[in-house]
Amino acid sequence: MAKNKNIEVSGRKITLYSNKSDDYLSLTDMARYRDADRTNYIIQNWMRTRSAIEFCGLWEQLKNPDFKRIEFDAFKNESGSNSFVLTPQKWIEKTNAIGIISKSGRYGGTFAHRDIAFEFATWISPEFKFYLRENNQLVHQAGGQLTADGNK
C-alpha cells in the first residue's frame, strides 16, 4: 500500500491511498459522519443491505477474476432477513473480495475502492457524497499531491 493521504469532506478527515492505479477511501472515516463512536455498526448496516451486496458483487465480478460467485449468491439470498449480519471481514474472507480491505491496529479500518466508497457515501448522505466526489476530483486534478491536512 502506498502512503496514506487525507482529504477533508464536510469537516471530516477521510484517509485516501492509492494502490497501483486504484484509489481506496476509508469507510471508517466516512462512517464518522453518521456516528463517530460506532463506525463498525454503520458499515455493517450498509453491507447487509441488498443494494450494497449487489453493487459490491457486480464490482467484484467485473474487476476480480478470483471472486467467489457462489458465496456472493448466498449472501445475496440472505439479504433482507432481519437476522442477516455481514461484516467487511466476512465478505472479504468468504468471497475473496478485493474492493474492500479491512486492516486492524493503528492506522487500520475498513477501506474501499473509490467506486464502492462513493456508493457507501450515497447511503451515508447525498450531500456527503457530493462533497466527497468534488474533493476527490480536486486530488486527481492536482496530480494526487496533498499535504498531511488534505490541502493542495
Question: Over which residues does each language-model region extend?
Answer:
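An anion-engaging/catalytic patch
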Residues: 1-152
